[in-house]
Amino acid sequence: MIENGQATVARNPVLFFLFIYKNTIGQRFPAINPFIYGGFLEHGANIINHTMWAEIFHDRKFYYGIQEKEEAKPDPSNFRAAMAYIHKWTAIGPMSDIFLDKTAPYVGEQSPGAKLGSAPRGFAQSHISLVRGKAYTGRIVVSAEQDTEITLTLIEELNRQTVKLKAGKAWSTVPFSFTAASDTTEARFEITATGSGSFRVGAVSMMPADNIKGFRADTIALMKEMDCKTLRMPGGNFISAYDWKHTIGDPDKRPPIFDPVWKALQPNDAGLDELLQMCELINCVPNWCVNTGYGEPRSGAEIVEYVNGAPDTFWGAKRAANGRVQPYKVKYWNIGNEMYGHWQFGHMSRDQYVIKHNLFADAMRKVDPSIYIIVPGGFVDEMTTGQGIFIAGQPQVHVGSERDWAYGMLKHSMGKFDALATHAYPPENKRFDLKTGKLFDVQQTLTEWARQPAQRIATMADAWEEYKKHFPVLNEGKIKVFFDEWAFSFRDSYKGTLAVALAFHEFFKHTDFIEMAGYTMATAWMNVNPTTSSISAKGRVFQLYNQHFGSIPVGISGNSPQPAPQYPAGGDQPKVNTGSATYPLDVIAALTADGKTLTVAVVNPTESAQSLELTLEGFQSSSQGRVWSLVGKSLDATNAPGKQPDVVIKDAAFDARTRRFQLAPATIQIYHFPKSS
């Protein structure tokens, strides 16, 4: 709902009938799995390291060594480069006094050092954000050619704090702490010494003292408030060049690596144990993705044993030695990510990959037969719209063809998985042309714009119906679909919440086989800067449905059908446009699990006010109801960190005997009709 917006009331109200039969079997549908409100969290670039992880320093293990001067920030429009950007360490004193020990480094391929003299020598990192009065704790791993006093200095404009520590020939880890004197984004941290000889630094770390197992207290609190049911992680394309063994054990001894997928430094600090423990902190079920790109079945079996094995197994013992005796008992395992994509590290043909998958599944289930396996689906709609190999003159991928990845998985790997994964990232204001295989710009109304993600869910559902004809076992309902990557309009805005709401409505229509959805990225539920955070506009719409919509969808009908498709079915165009027969509104209903409350969600994705008349059949409501509304100051409204939110959820009482409702422009509302006693 747009507050204080100008609206034109529709002349003709939409008459919409909601039927809930006393014979409840006929019009009730399978329950909504709460995993529909799940997230996807890729460990690429700074996605986790600069939002969830509490580390203050960039490149704390000196992968890039020491620079003579700061590098310029990349153009923000270069999304990937901006995501990968980090602050580098710079020299204090001449570069000729700086060296990199590649012979006996503490971790990784090099450890920096400085030759000493009468003037301070060492290195520094700038542009550090701090909060006044907040305590920060850290540690530094140091050694010196001879006994040397090293000075750590935290500089905030005119304020300087110092900590002095001793270093000797052997590497030693020394703790330190500071309390910030100001709110700043431009603090500087220096590591220096004077005298003779030289000193080296193996690693250095500093975090807010209130960190929770290495994670930011503020973003952990927000993710817990989001009540996220499941997270798919740590990839993503990232996973296909990821070695999980680099991410366990002493964090200071984990090698920093250059991630070739995101072209970014990965310090491997938020590792396997940390991410699984993060899920425990926020009460979330992990869905772990395994590397089938550069990985091999042995590695898949080993990670299952590390995560789920008893402490007397080989890898379970290593987990116990790393501080976690009890197994994590992870049930959901994503074997591979988008392996149908030619861009995927380790990509191979479909007919070769199914063999590799089967080897992975057998090896992993030998370790733990109870695991639930999800595989890269690559449905024909996804393969047509850019995820598959393009053939000139044949842009559309048909069910059963060689380019239909899902068909190959169903044909050759049936029994080796429990669910197929599919992904969708529809571009804004574009349509896919089935004749040319190209995207074309289109002028769209707000309604057409907002329904694009829902349309892609529907094209996948169309494909599923075709797969059921080829593989009748799918009709039994045991094999599910995990829509574990989806997003639209990566800018956070109230406008984008309309698209999310309509996508939810489409998901709710397919509860017989869509078991999970993972929004890209789960961190998009928050807006974050280095010191504070807030739940984003999109986060609020997830909360609205997660907290207030029912779990048992019921049948509805209306007298205003959605318009017929403008374009031929296929690619990004479903056979029938999405939405309920209440055009231009979209309405969906569900009972709560106990059957005591009927919830009705209404989206007005237009820029005009609309009217709606409601009839309930087979359900007698009490007189007092409640309505929850998502309210934004404008379509562009967002929730900036540290400021009053511009997108909020508001609730109010209403007369549940009312049957006519006025819907403001760009409205998302959920009505509760309690059942009369």
What are these regions (language model features)?
Residues L18-N268, V285, A301, D351, ...:
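Extracellular and organelle-lumenal recognition/adhesion modules and their flexible linkers in secreted
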Residues V141-E145, T179-A181, Q547, V603-P605, ...:
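Solvent-exposed strand-to-loop "edge" motifs in beta-rich extracellular domains
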Residues A181, R188, P208-C228, L275, ...:
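An active-site-proximal structural segment forming one wall of the substrate-binding cleft
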Residues A187-I191, R350-F504, S560-T578:
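Noncatalytic carbohydrate-binding groove/subsite architecture in carbohydrate-active enzymes
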Residues A193, P234-G235, F314-M348, H423-E428, ...:
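Active-site groove signature of glycoside hydrolases
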Residues F508-L598, E607-Q610:
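Aromatic- and carboxylate-lined catalytic core of secreted/periplasmic carbohydrate-active enzymes
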Residues S580-S623, V627, G632, A666-H672:
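Carbohydrate-binding surface patches
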Residues F619-L663:
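Acidic, Ser/Thr/Pro-rich beta/coil linker or hinge segments at domain junctions
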